[in-house]
Amino acid sequence: LLPNLLKSLL
């Protein structure tokens, strides 16, 4: 969940 958003930002 969170990791997905983080990767999207990066």
From Swiss-Prot:
Domain of life: Eukaryota
Major localization listed first in the record, in broad terms: secreted
Signal peptide: none
Leucine amide: modified positions: L10
Residues annotated as transmembrane: none
GO cellular component terms, semicolon-separated: extracellular region
Protein name (record): Temporin-1Tk
